[in-house]
Amino acid sequence: MANGTLPPDSRYSRLDHGSLIPVEQINFPNIPGVTGPEGIFNTRFLYYRGPKYDTDDLSGVIAVEPPIPLLEYPSLVPQIDADGNDIDGLRSHILRAPLGTYTGWNVRAAGFSQGDACDLTGSYIPFAVTKAERLANGDPRLSLQERYTNTAGYTAAVTAAVNRLVSERLMLASDAAGAISNATAWFTQASGGMLQ
């Protein structure tokens, strides 16, 4: 709390909002050349390790080895939109005016442990620049051209997103101009300068 003003409410995925779901219900878009998150989540169990072992504080004597699984913890993940981006949580201006799919996970490429989760590394999967490119690639996500038309359209979208964040007290007004400028530069780079 600063100057008697409470911070904005917390924002996170929740079961009662339908924004936190069992992992098997995730519906990641079928992006060509991209492996979805299916099968890369760790299953966790509560184990029985014997009568002298305390599972609450992980102390005591392990008398049962291998341990006996008692129950499987549910694997829950954030719900995603049609682009594959999380729908809840603190959505920055980059998620509110996206240039691609942003994930908190990544899958290992060819070589060591191919197809396994790549720990602590997220992904950025850019949108196609034009509708023709999107259709040729079979990408279900709208292209930059279809979303924003051109740089001015993107700048308008990201400006609206930044203004909403400022009004929601999730971004400082003094950071707005820099956020818009940086995002517009990223759009120019992502579009290869083709959508002026």
PLM regions: where:
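C-terminal His-loop and adjacent cap/lid subdomain of alpha/beta-hydrolase
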Residues: 1-196
